[in-house]
Curated annotation (Swiss-Prot):
Record-listed E.C. numbers: 5.1.3.9
UniProt name for this protein: Putative N-acetylmannosamine-6-phosphate 2-epimerase
HAMAP family in the cross-refs: ManNAc6P_epimer (MF_01235)
Family: Belongs to the NanE family.
Pfam families from the UniProt entry: NanE
Keywords: Carbohydrate metabolism, Isomerase
NCBIfam families: PRK01130.1 (NF002231)
Associated pathway: Amino-sugar metabolism; N-acetylneuraminate degradation; D-fructose 6-phosphate from N-acetylneuraminate: step 3/5
Record GO terms (molecular function): N-acylglucosamine-6-phosphate 2-epimerase activity
Keyword Isomerase: yes
Organism: Caldanaerobacter subterraneus subsp. tengcongensis (strain DSM 15242 / JCM 11007 / NBRC 100824 / MB4)
Catalytic activity entry: an N-acyl-D-glucosamine 6-phosphate = an N-acyl-D-mannosamine 6-phosphate
One GO BP: N-acetylmannosamine catabolic process
Amino acid sequence: MQMDIIQKLENGLIVSCQALEGEPLHSPFIMAKMAKAAEIGGAVAIRANGYEDIVAIKKEVSIPVIGLIKKRYEGYAPYITPTMEEVDKVIEAGADIVAIDATKAYKPGGLTTGEFLKRIKEKYPKILVMADISTYEEGIEAEKLGFDLISTTLSGYTEYSPELEGPDYELIERLARKVNVPIIAEGRIWTPEEAVKALEKGAYAVVVGTAITRPHEITRRFVTFIKERRYSNVRAK
């Protein structure tokens, strides 16, 4: 069953359907419809944030759902499914894969990533767990710890990982050449060409979110691009 889910992702597009509180599309109903549209378009899986969103999306789509819950805890950097409380809710909501922060930062309660994963696997031995990492070293460690999938989600979003304008192709390729766990490319992928390049670098599948499901960011990108360009004088005066 676990391998069946993983195999469905191979060489495919995973669409991240997430809207943060305060954004116009912040609604389980809207995210479920967005996920359905992604499935119709050929997405192989959905990445979703929040109990209500996961429940609503699972009712709409037949493809796998990668679930997470973003929650901040004072004094701790990890915010992607950082404790067992969030893990329990993600699994209760019906997610097929649970994504967690797998960086070197301690989780709430002082747990290491390895200790946290052990607790998850002891309670839910059949659930697939995705490691959201930010560096090559974290990816290598994630395989050693026993994660089922590794995603480059947090590259550029930790204090010690490189800030890049585009996808972290170097990280994708280095991990793909070294580990046997599927590498999922995520982060700053805006075009089909960038998605294909990530696969060419060894990614097992590609996650695209903002470029598909956050229209205010897509609009802002167009507006910024237009404002930064100079125009010809071919228009009639």
